[in-house]
């Protein structure tokens, strides 16, 4: 994309670039910024059973530095940040973009996209639990007597975090960037102060150590890779949050602060362990003097809360995209800011995440145990993104097949190796993220498939709208009574007479002066300009067909959109307008095309969906619902 194509990046002043880059430090890099708390410690464990050698320590740090370089810097910062959907990034944004050009393998792309989104939602459960636990565990070094209170303290912090979501975080969000920036600077300073413990650690910049270690260690080398991958967890946030900050601020923050700070800290941890092998039990916190431990624990806890907040917000945003793209049932979405429509709260998602996070903390109890389960969801999401990126460069950038293979195949192979290394931890809790991701994938696939079958079933009994209008406007003794005002009938199929219109005629025997057949569509792009918001077609003197178009990142506020429609010439008084909605009772059918259990599950999801009148922000006192029954 060009610089000007992104809303944040047109004519960007240095001060605006600085503040956006600072903001991205808190939101985009919060997750990856908490990895030093546990990544090196976990990577040491598989090879420390028979003592550590100098070569092993240097090789581990080398693996971490080159993982950050190849996966984060090359794949995400330099490449994927350019693969945007009109400024927006993330798995579902990429899927929406690819659906425009998919040829013959739409179902495969869709399943991949849903799996990527599901893995991200699983990550949104594990990240808060792991990061807060790992930060609070620093209290053991401050006061060993607090060891028994680590889990209760973590639960309280996480509970408060989820409770405040409904109030919005706009008031404190401005501090996220500066606090996280201080966190990175403190980590960098600690790393610098310990590199002098053994300057030999600087040999880790040589990739020879990383490659040689993997070749010589065999099985243990593969196991270690699973822990090494913890250094890049959070990289998906760079792409997912592209729309919030823009490409340049995210890149500047990475190269000027985040990447140097992470590298220096890992080098410092490595040098510390080389000089004092006994510090391998917790090299991150043992880098700091006793007097600094408590302040660092407090700062680490703040950083992990910010990282957790970022991933929770990302989950809310992804769910809204999923709803608008038709992958999830409608849910109640509350806006927590009057000025920023991106700040939302989804109560049902918040509740599910809260239950999941607390369950993980109480089940695993330590960051050591939880870290084993962490990598699978992240590596899985990265593999999915890489495969979809391959399709993107072929379809959107017109890369030849050989060029796409040469550029992306090494990344996919590397990430598959990381995924394989993490799959070795299935029996140690690695099954948890797989179960979570499977559950979310089943939900999204069931909803998508069920709504498609529902649409197909209703189409068989539909009456073409032009034929209906022609018949109803013929004057006869059986013509319905005409009443003043406007009736708006919501329908997903603008070519057919809406069920609500037919039921209204059948039961009430009336027809309004003006009848609007309204269809709401979601575009395969994040936002739609007001001049492109609607399309009006006059079918007859009394019937109009209107299509409202929203971006998948927008609130589908029909009342506001209709105000724009009035300015365009469709005259009606909102206070004398009635909205007619069809309410379908779905009954399972063994011959629906889905297994019976999936039929039942779809009905459960449909019954739990929020009302269309609430989701589309219709005036409550102007809505009429007419029921019908359909077998699916």
Curated annotation (Swiss-Prot):
Catalysed reaction, written as an equation: K(+)(in) + H(+)(in) = K(+)(out) + H(+)(out)
GO cellular component term of the entry, any: plasma membrane
Subcellular location: Cell inner membrane
Membrane topology label: Multi-pass membrane protein
Range of residues in the leader sequence: none
InterPro entries: K+_transporter, K_trans_C, K_trans_N, Kup
GO MF, one example: symporter activity
Main location: membrane
Source superkingdom: Bacteria
Regions crossing the membrane: 17-37, 60-80, 106-126, 144-164, 175-195, 210-230, 254-274, 292-312, 344-364, 370-390, 401-421, 426-446
Family note: Belongs to the HAK/KUP transporter (TC 2.A.72) family.
Protein name: Probable potassium transport system protein Kup 3
């Amino acid at each position: 994309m060009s610089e000007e194509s992104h809303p944040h990046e047109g004519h960007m002043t240095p001060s605006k670039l600085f503040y956006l880059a600072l903001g991205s430090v808190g939101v985009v890099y919060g997750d990856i910024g908490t990895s030093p708390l546990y990544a090196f410690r976990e990577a040491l464990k598989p090879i420390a059973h028979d003592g550590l050698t100098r070569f092993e320590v240097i090789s581990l740090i080398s693996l971490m530095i080159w993982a950050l370089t190849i996966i984060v810097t090359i794949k995400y910062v330099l490449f994927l940040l350019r693969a945007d959907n009109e400024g927006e990034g993330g798995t579902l944004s990429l899927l929406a973009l690819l659906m425009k050009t998919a040829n013959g393998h739409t179902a495969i792309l869709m399943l991949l996209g849903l799996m990527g989104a599901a893995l991200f939602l699983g990550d949104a459960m594990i990240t808060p639990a792991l990061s807060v636990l790992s930060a609070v565990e620093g209290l053991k070094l401050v006061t060993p007597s607090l060891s028994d209170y680590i889990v209760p303290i973590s639960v309280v912090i996480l509970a408060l975090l989820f409770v405040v979501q409904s109030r919005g975080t706009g008031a404190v969000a401005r501090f996220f960037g500066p606090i996280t920036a201080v966190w990175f600077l403190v980590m960098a300073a600690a790393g610098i102060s310990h590199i002098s413990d053994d300057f030999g650690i600087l040999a880790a910049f040589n990739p020879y150590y990383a490659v040689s270690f993997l070749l010589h260690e065999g099985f243990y080398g593969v196991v270690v890779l699973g822990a090494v991958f913890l250094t890049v967890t959070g990289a998906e946030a760079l792409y997912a949050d592209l729309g919030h900050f823009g490409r340049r601020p995210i890149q500047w923050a990475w190269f000027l602060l985040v990447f140097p700070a992470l590298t220096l800290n890992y080098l410092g941890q490595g040098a510390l362990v080389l000089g004092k092998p006994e510090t391998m039990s917790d090299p991150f916190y043992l880098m700091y003097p006793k007097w600094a431990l408590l302040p660092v624990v407090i700062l680490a806890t703040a950083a992990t809360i910010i990282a957790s907040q970022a991933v929770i917000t990302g989950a809310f945003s992804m769910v809204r995209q999923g709803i608008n793209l038709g992958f999830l049932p409608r849910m109640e979405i509350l806006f927590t800011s009057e000025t920023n429509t991106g700040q939302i709260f989804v109560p049902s998602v918040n509740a599910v995440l809260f239950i999941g996070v607390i369950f993980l903390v109480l089940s695993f109890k330590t960051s050591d145990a939880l870290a084993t389960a962490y990598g699978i969801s992240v590596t899985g999401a990265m593999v999915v993104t890489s495969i979809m990126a391959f399709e993107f460069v072929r379809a959107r950038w017109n890369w030849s097949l050989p060029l796409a293979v040469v550029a992306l195949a090494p990344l996919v192979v590397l990430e598959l190796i990381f995924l394989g290394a993490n799959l070795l931890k299935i029996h140690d809790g690695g099954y948890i993220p797989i179960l979570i991701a499977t559950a979310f994938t089943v939900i999204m696939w069931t909803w998508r498939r069920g709504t498609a079958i529902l649409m197909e079933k209703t189409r068989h009994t539909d009456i073409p709208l032009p034929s209906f209008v022609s018949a109803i406007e013929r004057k006869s003794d059986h013509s319905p009574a005409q009443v003043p005002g406007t009736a708006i009938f919501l329908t997903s199929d603008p070519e057919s007479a809406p069920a609500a219109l037919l039921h209204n005629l059948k039961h009430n025997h009336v027809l309004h002066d003006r009848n609007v057949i309204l269809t709401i569509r979601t575009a395969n792009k994040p936002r739609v300009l007001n001049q492109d918001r609607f399309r009006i077609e006059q079918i007859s003197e009394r019937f109009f067909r209107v299509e409202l178009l929203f971006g998948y990142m927008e609130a589908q506020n029909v009342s506001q959109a209709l105000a724009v429609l009035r300015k365009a010439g469709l005259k009606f008084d909102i206070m004398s307008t009635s909205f007619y909605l069809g309410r379908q009772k779905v009954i399972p059918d063994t011959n629906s095309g889905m297994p019976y259990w999936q039929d039942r599950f779809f009905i459960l999801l449909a019954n739990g969906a929020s009302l269309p009148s609430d989701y589309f922000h219709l005036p409550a006192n102007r809505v009429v619902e007419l029921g019908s029954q359909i077998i699916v």
